[in-house]
Amino acid sequence: MHCPFCGANDTKVIDSRLVAEGEQVRRRRECVACGERFTTFETAELVLPRLIKQDGTRQPFDEDKLRAGMQRALEKRPVSIERLEAALAHIKSRLRATGEREVKSLVVGEMVMAELRKLDEVAYIRFASVYRRFQDLDEFREEIDRLAREPAKE
């Protein structure tokens, strides 16, 4: 790492500690050339995979778009913003855990439905009706019956 004081290339690490609940490493460094000390913070670069849409196009993961879709389904439902944010964090964590550079949008849609089902069954049905393109009342009934038969997966 370059010294921010003299620009030399050679610095040494004097001390390293975990900070931010283990999410960052704080390093105390010293320049070999000028002797000045400085602190750096290191964090892992956590990149979310790109999405492969049903038509084959690819686009970057858009957290705001995901949040807006979930908020639309949860509109006027008794679910706190904290619970919504926790569900979003869980989806992002699961996407990172795949280790893939790209995932099908279908996978994300299923993750959203699973999270909404845990949050609020009415919101789940709302989202499912749009996501699965329900055409008539029979499709709503089938989904509601399935919801009643199968417990939500934690």
From Swiss-Prot:
Binds 1 zinc ion. The gene is nrdR. A zinc finger (unnamed) spans 3-34. Negatively regulates transcription of bacterial ribonucleotide reductase nrd genes and operons by binding to NrdR-boxes. Residues 49-139 form the ATP-cone domain. Coiled coil: none annotated. This is Transcriptional repressor NrdR. NCBIfam families: transcriptional regulator NrdR. One of its GO terms (biological process) is negative regulation of DNA-templated transcription. GO terms for molecular function: ATP binding; DNA binding; zinc ion binding.
